[in-house]
Amino acid sequence: NKDFEKVNGLCLRDKENIYKFTNPRALISDLDTVPYPAYHLLETDIYFEHSAYSYSVESFNSKRRASTCWERGCPRGCTFCSHNGMSRIDLQNIYGDGDRKKGEKLVRIVDKENETFQMPARWPTPEYAINNVKLLKDELDVDFISIVDENMTSNLKWTKEFCRLYVEEGLDKEIKWGTLGDAPSVAVKPEIVKTMKDAGCTYISFGFESASDKVLNQDIQKGQIRAHLQKTVDTMLANDMTPLTTFMMGNPHENIDDLMETLDFWIKNKASIDPFICTPYVGSPLFYDNQDFVLQQYDERLKLVFEGKAHVDKEIVAKWKLSALDKFMTDCGDAFQYTATVSQYFTIPELFALKNFMYKHDARRLLQMAHQRFEQTK
């Protein structure tokens, strides 16, 4: 019989059927108190049939691979990342009704009661993680673990202790593993790669995004530069591990010169990469900064209103925006469905052409397009 409006952390509809958010809920301060998943309730054999994962020889040959995630949050604030939709940034937008400064005041109320909101990333203890691996071994007889934490190379103290315990328990001989990392941490502390490899790690995947310092600083905002990327590649090769990297194109301020810088990086490192096309997921700063432009691509009437060519009642425009947002979010449900562009330089067809040129290392076609653009501006 509790009043739901007094329960923190809910999104609900009131008596007038209008949705509202209750106050923020404090995060769990001690992640060791979180119960392990009830693996016995899952139909795991369905998943084990698709265990092969082409990130390393060991992951590809695995027959009973499982994934696990221990990290909560992220120490970075990449503009494109949908994880921001589960972070303080999203809380600020929700509780401030789009005004992050206003929302921050409300979130700070929770800060006074619980310090977890002040921490960009949180982990359980390494012992908790090791016991989780043991549980997976005992209950599911797994032969490989994909640790989907995105920052194992960032928290050096935690990762070193995890690796020490992993070897101490003899797990490195029985269950190989792989994870994700970040270039700046590896560039500054390259020894972490050897530590992880010696503990059974067979792959580390990195989100490089672009090899243009301009794009990395202006658009991506991950806190990394091209020099970090090169140092990471060199470190991985020195440890006999294949550098696994992902890139994206179609960033707001990315032009052909920037794409040429990225292609130059690929060619120098003999890398074969099929880049993703930048997607402004809802909840990310990339979406909030380009919201009008994104929604106009799903309803051309909004573009006319935005350009002042049509004068429509605000309530009607609001309905159009909600409808466009619904269509956009539906498309985002399929990773293979291209959605909207945020590029200031290229149309959607051009992005697909450029993606093909990049994948084929076709610098000639890229330069040809650049010359065509130059001629058109004369």
Q: Where are these predicted regions, by residue range?
A:
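A charged, well-structured terminal subsegment
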Residues: 1-15
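C-terminal accessory regions of radical SAM enzymes
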Residues: 11-27, 48, 52-56, 65, ...
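Conserved strand-turn element in the central/C-terminal portion of the radical SAM core barrel
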Residues: 181-184, 209-222, 233-258, 276-282, ...
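Radical SAM [4Fe-4S] cluster-binding motif and immediate context
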Residues: 40-244, 264
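Pocket-edge positions in alpha/beta enzyme catalytic cores
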Residues: 23-26, 121, 221, 251
